[in-house]
């Protein structure tokens, strides 16, 4: 696919996630799609919880679901996106952190995604406090 088409694909993926449009999200993925999160997080590695199960309780509003994706680089088969993750705990504590995602694209669909947090410790700390209350 072209660079422009891949840029659009990446932004469409983020739009589907922000809008919680699971059907559209699945349409944008290859059947063998792989997702890789840091193993130190509750949804990383081979842990049972998913990103959605972990974060959706803390992203009830549109503000928290907004990811502000910015395509940093894109080629014919991969892209890098800088995006923000937000959440609010039941006690009102707010979290906002930046990530870089490395995305592989094959046949016009997302094949692989790997996330790199700028501060994994802050994410883990927020989740621990937010779920222990």
Predicted regions located by residue number:
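Hydrophobic/aromatic beta-strand elements that line small-molecule binding cavities or substrate pockets
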Residues: 55, 66-73, 84-87, 98-104, ...
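Short, cysteine-centered beta-strand-loop-beta hairpins and adjacent loop/turn segments enriched
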Residues: 60, 87-96
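Short, low-complexity N-terminal intrinsically disordered segments enriched in polar/charged residues
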Residues: 1-31, 129-133
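Hydrophobic pocket/interface hotspot
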Residues: 10-13, 24-26, 33, 50-51, ...
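Low-complexity, intrinsically disordered terminal/linker segments enriched in charged
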Residues: 112-133
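A solvent-exposed, acidic/Ser-Thr-rich amphipathic alpha-helical stretch
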Residues: 23-77
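Hydrophobic/basic alpha-helical segments enriched in Actinobacteria
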Residues: 6, 91, 104-106, 122
């Amino acid at each position: 696919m072209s660079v422009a088409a891949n840029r659009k694909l990446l932004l469409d993926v983020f739009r589907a996630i922000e809008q919680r449009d699971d059907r559209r999200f699945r349409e944008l993925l290859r059947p063998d799609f792989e997702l890789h999160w840091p193993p130190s997080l509750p949804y990383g590695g081979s842990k049972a919880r998913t990103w959605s199960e972990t974060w959706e309780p803390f992203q009830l509003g549109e503000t928290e679901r907004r990811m502000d994706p910015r395509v940093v680089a894109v080629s014919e088969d991969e892209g890098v996106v800088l995006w923000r993750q937000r959440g609010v705990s039941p006690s009102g504590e707010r979290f906002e952190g930046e990530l870089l995602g490395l995305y592989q694209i094959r046949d016009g669909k997302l094949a692989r995604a790997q996330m790199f947090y700028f501060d994994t410790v802050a994410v883990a700390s927020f989740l621990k406090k937010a779920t222990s209350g």
